[in-house]
């Protein structure tokens, strides 16, 4: 599906104050009482809230066709919240709601639709605060301190379902089959939809729907559901409800990109004290895991996560490929998460001042032209001429470009340190000054071999996440991962009267931030030195940072005030990869891949059974975040935690494949090229 702006719903309102979709000429809920209709049809029809009490797993997963006003979600959340307050010791801790919506409402329309139900306000306010841009794809919203997850998939449900990742197979406990009436919206009520409902349903998963149309009843029966007609709501004579009776076997697509969950998710070690490790820890803690973090430094954020200012904006390329799709989703998720951190009292310097990417030469101009050929929501990206950019930036900018209104800058060092403190408050055990030198697998899980103050130690954990930045290849299990260490130097520039006028982040063949009010310095950067691992100050790189700015904005007089003579800077080492995508998932077992998967193309051609690509059990990686960890780390951490806990993931199968740690080797094999066994 194209990752771009989608049409929002256009509404009218009838005499009863009920919203009507002009696209479908149908009401969003009953004129009689929408809230009671939801409780009767979708909650009672699926045996909620009573069913919460007998649910034996920690998470209950609900899927819905047609989010509409969100009334079904809010009503179920209200019931779940009451259940949790009355049953704090029950096994069920979390609610995961997945909904598909072709025409999302605007925020103001959403608020107007909810006015008649003040009892839902405590829940609807949280929805408004995170309501996403009208951007195709999945938007994950985390609410109630992690107890409630809402995955909003914007787009046509029948276009989206074939792209869903195998993490959804067999996970849905109940379906809310909503959407406009079959007579008004016949395209949605398809055989493809009913088949997918059965495929994604948990064994004995249920469904309920307001309609009793024969095409719906027969379609669900053919898909494998036992279907019953029951009394409809209000004046409606009948509705349908049922349970999955027969789950037809469906071979999972692309087993070479399988994502096995952890067989043990209660005891997890994380190696690394940067933003990737800390955000992964928080995501795991939200799910109830016991987390121990090992960091070779004396404090968090001593590596690449320790900079004063880092820019946050999406990575667009106009190609509608996995990279662009991932980074648009990652950016919007990151903004939501950072705002939640602020609301939780995590204190870190930041300004959501916008980011302006400049067309400073012919190559960058063509690149931006290609990016703007896609119709993006104005909240995400908007093209501007040089006069508009100058007004937006507060300084003369003699170039056109693209502006990201919701971008900005934040302090990675402060964010990482404050997030670490929050994780510790939530129960994470931190072992600083503990260097993990090796990993070995045994019958109890993974043994970590440590050095602490000159002494050799061992620690045992069931599951391990490697999040150690450019040190990623240091272990035997990860030494062949195709990542590269790249040094970068960021220059710290004292502000001046003119430079202090800069209102947003500038991106050119480098970047420059507005002055941080806390220290009255700008950051410009950053150099790019491959395979250099020292953290020493470089005068050459300091001058290169300044020269790039002067070259790209040669017509602007104010750039001459950029003074690097004080030699203030910070050096760090990035972990980068050729395709610029993070590595998120299971650590692949390359030796077994080379023995078990060399004939992959032949097996595909002949239809022979293909096992999942070999990987190390209960060993995971989040790395290769490069220069964009502030953007990619929050969503990457959420994906990894979801995988470890065997949850539905908030990206489609195409994007998840581009994040898989084995992707380079699998791509070679799929092209018919043999993998060479390299001698150590």
Curated annotation (Swiss-Prot):
Q: Region entry tRNA (mnm(5)s(2)U34)-methyltransferase: which residue ranges?
A: 1-245
Q: What are the GO BP annotations of this UniProt entry?
A: methylation; tRNA wobble uridine modification
Q: Which cofactor does it need?
A: FAD
What is the reaction catalyzed? 5-aminomethyl-2-thiouridine(34) in tRNA + S-adenosyl-L-methionine = 5-methylaminomethyl-2-thiouridine(34) in tRNA + S-adenosyl-L-homocysteine + H(+)
Query: Can the keyword Ubl conjugation be found in this entry's annotation?
Result: no
- UniProt main location, coarse: cytoplasm
**Stretch list, region FAD-dependent cmnm(5)s(2)U34 oxidoreductase:** 271-680
A GO cellular component entry from the record:
cytoplasm
Q: Which NCBIfam families match?
A: MnmC_Cterm, PRK01747.1-2, PRK01747.1-3, PRK01747.1-5, tRNA_MNMC2
Q: What's the name of the protein? A: tRNA 5-methylaminomethyl-2-thiouridine biosynthesis bifunctional protein MnmC
Q: Which organism is it from?
A: Photorhabdus laumondii subsp. laumondii (strain DSM 15139 / CIP 105565 / TT01)
């Amino acid at each position: 599906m194209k990752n771009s702006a989608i049409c929002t719903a256009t509404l009218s309102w009838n005499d009863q104050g009920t919203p009507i979709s002009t696209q479908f000429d149908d009401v969003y809920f009953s004129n009689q009482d929408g809230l009671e209709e939801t409780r009767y049809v979708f909650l009672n029809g699926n045996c909620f809230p009573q069913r919460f009490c007998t649910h034996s797993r920690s998470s209950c997963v609900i899927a819905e066709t047609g989010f509409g006003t969100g009334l079904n979600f809010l009503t179920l959340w209200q019931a779940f919240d009451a259940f949790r307050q009355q049953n704090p010791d029950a096994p069920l801790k979390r609610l995961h709601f997945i909904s598909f919506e072709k025409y999302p409402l605007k925020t103001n329309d959403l608020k107007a639709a909810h006015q008649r139900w003040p009892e839902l306000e405590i829940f609807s306010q949280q929805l408004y605060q995170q309501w996403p841009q009208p951007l195709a794809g999945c938007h994950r919203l985390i609410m109630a301190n992690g107890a409630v997850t809402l995955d909003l998939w914007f787009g046509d449900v029948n276009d989206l379902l074939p792209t869903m990742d195998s993490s959804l197979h067999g996970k849905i406990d109940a379906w809310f089959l909503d959407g406009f009436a079959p007579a008004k919206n016949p395209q949605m009520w398809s055989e493809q939809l009913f088949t997918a409902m059965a495929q994604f349903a948990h064994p004995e998963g249920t469904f309920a729907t307001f309609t009793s149309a024969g095409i719906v009843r027969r379609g669900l029966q053919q898909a494998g559901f036992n279907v019953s007609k029951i009394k409809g709501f209000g004046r409606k004579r009948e509705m349908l409800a049922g349970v999955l009776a027969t789950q037809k076997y469906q071979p999972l697509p692309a087993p070479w990109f399988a994502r096995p969950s952890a067989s043990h998710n209660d005891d997890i070690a994380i190696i690394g004290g940067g933003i990737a490790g800390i955000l992964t820890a928080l995501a795991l803690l939200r799910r109830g895991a016991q987390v121990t973090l090992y960091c070779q430094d004396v404090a968090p954020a001593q590596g690449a996560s320790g900079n004063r200012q880092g820019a946050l904006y999406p990575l667009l390329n106009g190609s509608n490929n996995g990279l662009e799709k991932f980074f648009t989703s990652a950016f919007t998720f990151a903004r939501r998460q950072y705002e939640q951190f602020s609301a939780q009292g995590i204190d870190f310097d930041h300004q959501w001042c916008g980011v302006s990417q400049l067309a400073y030469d012919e190559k960058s101009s063509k690149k931006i032209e290609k990016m703007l050929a896609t119709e993006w929501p104005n909240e995400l990206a908007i093209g501007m001429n040089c006069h508009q950019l100058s007004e937006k930036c507060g300084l003369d900018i003699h170039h056109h470009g693209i502006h990201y209104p919701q971008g900005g800058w934040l302090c990675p060092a402060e964010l990482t340190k404050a997030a670490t403190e929050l994780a510790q408050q939530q129960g994470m055990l931190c072992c600083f000054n503990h260097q993990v030198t090796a990993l070995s697998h045994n019958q109890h899980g993974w043994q970590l071999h440590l050095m602490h103050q000159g002494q050799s130690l061992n620690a045992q954990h069931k599951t391990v996440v490697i999040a150690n930045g450019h040190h990623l290849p240091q272990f035997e299990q990860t030494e062949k991962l195709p990542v590269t260490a790249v040094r970068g130097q960021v220059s710290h520039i004292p502000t001046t009267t003119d430079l202090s006028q800069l209102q947003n982040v500038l991106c050119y063949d480098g970047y420059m931030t507005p002055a941080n009010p806390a220290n009255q310095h700008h950051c410009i950067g950053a150099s790019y030195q491959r395979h250099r691992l020292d953290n020493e100050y470089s005068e050459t790189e300091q001058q290169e940072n300044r020269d790039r700015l002067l070259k790209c904005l040669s017509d602007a007089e104010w750039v001459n005030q950029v003074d690097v003579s004080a030699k203030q800077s910070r050096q760090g080492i990035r972990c980068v990869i050729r395709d610029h995508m993070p590595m998120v998932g299971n650590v692949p077992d390359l030796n077994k891949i080379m023995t078990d998967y060399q004939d992959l193309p032949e097996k595909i051609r002949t239809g022979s059974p293909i096992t999942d690509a070999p990987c190390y059990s209960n060993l995971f990686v989040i790395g290769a975040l490069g220069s964009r960890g502030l953007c990619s780390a929050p969503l990457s951490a959420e994906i990894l935690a979801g995988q470890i806990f065997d949850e539905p993931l908030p990206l489609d199968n195409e994007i998840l494949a581009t994040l898989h740690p084995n992707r380079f080797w699998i791509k070679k094999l799929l092209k018919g090229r043999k993998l060479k066994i390299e001698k150590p």
